[in-house]
Amino acid sequence: MGTDQLVRQAELLVGQVAHWTPARWRGRSDGVHALVQRLADAAAEAEGRTAYAVPRLADTVLPDQIRVMVADLVAAEHRPDVLDRLADDIRATRSAL
């Protein structure tokens, strides 16, 4: 599964939140930003570089940050078990929203 499942879960999450207004994000954005940070950390690990803090931009930018982090993970060809774990993480975040 790996890549396909990760991309699918990311698409579902982005589809769920991309249209949200700033008011709708209130109280929900911290969990999604934390997910973006975990995705960024995994991408850094896969690329063999130091992890960095993902900038905290406007909440409405979070869907784009998810897209970028998932694209980085796919390009880095991370291990399938890690991608499956991250797909589960995205699924759990979706459920929590």
Each PLM stretch: what is its role?
Residues W20-D64:
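Amphipathic alpha-helical interaction modules
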Residues M1-L39, A87-I90, R94:
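Short terminal alpha-helical segments
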Residues D64-L97:
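Amphipathic alpha-helical binding modules
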Residues V7, V14-V17, V32, V36, ...:
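Extended aliphatic helical segments
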Residues T3, S29, E47, P63, ...:
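Short, structured coil/loop segments at alpha-helix boundaries
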